Curated annotation (Swiss-Prot):
This is Interferon alpha-5. It comes from Mus musculus. GO terms for biological process: defense response to virus. Glycans are attached at residue 101. Keywords: Antiviral defense, Cytokine, Disulfide bond, Glycoprotein, Secreted, Signal. CDD domains: IFab. Belongs to the alpha/beta interferon family. It comes from the Eukaryota. One of its GO terms (molecular function) is cytokine receptor binding. Disulfide bonds join 24-122, 52-162. Residues 1-23 form the signal peptide. The keyword Disulfide bond applies. It is found in: Secreted.
Length: 189
């Protein structure tokens, strides 16, 4: 219930968030794709989170790298692109297809893939922007390690239904953080 309430609070941010003030031109449909992806993740839920309490785990979301106030615009887009790529990797794995409704999973992956294409195009527009390579690499590494922990967790739990439910909720949180970061960067400009 708490996650549903949090989701409903994020929807207005998604609806009004301008996408063209980040130093690149994200299409106007990008925020709609974010909204649809988050909605699909909610619909994908197969188990009550209460039934999986024993399986919960803190994956150590790198909030200081993805959601921190000090993250720079030029650094944000590559980091968000990496985060989106990692989400796609998890949900397009062979083990993922057995865990979810095929129609919802395909729709979710299509939305995430389109977001990734938007972000990659944005990264290409920023090629001339110089950001401290060490800072950016540190953030990218933090995102990769975070998703590695999620992948290891799924393997250790043998891709159980509860493990997938925990991961679904965690990915919802990660995508919500990315939405909030983009909204914050848009407001700063």
């Amino acid at each position: 219930m708490a996650r549903l309430c949090a989701f409903l609070m994020v929807l207005p941010v998604l609806s009004y968030w301008p996408t063209c003030s980040l130093g690149c031109d994200l299409p106007q449909t990008h925020n709609l794709r974010n909204k649809r992806a988050l909605t699909l993740l909610v619909k994908m839920r197969r188990l009550s989170p209460l039934s999986c309490l024993k399986d919960r785990k803190d994956f150590g979301f790198p909030q200081e790298k993805v959601g921190a106030q000090q993250i720079q615009e030029a650094q944000a887009i590559p980091v968000l692109s990496e985060l989106t790529q990692q989400v796609l990797n998890i949900f397009t794995s062979k083990d993922s297809s057995a865990a979810w409704n095929a129609t919802l999973l395909d729709s979710f992956c299509n939305e995430v893939h389109q977001q990734l294409n938007d972000l990659k195009a944005c990264v290409m527009q920023q090629v001339g922007v110089q950001e401290s390579p060490l800072t950016q690499e540190d953030s990218l590494l933090a995102v990769r390690k975070y998703f590695h922990r999620i992948t290891v967790y799924l393997r250790e739990k043998k891709h159980s239904p509860c493990a997938w439910e925990v991961v679904r909720a965690e990915v919802w949180r990660a995508l919500s953080s990315s939405v909030n970061l983009l909204a914050r960067l848009s407001k700063e400009e």
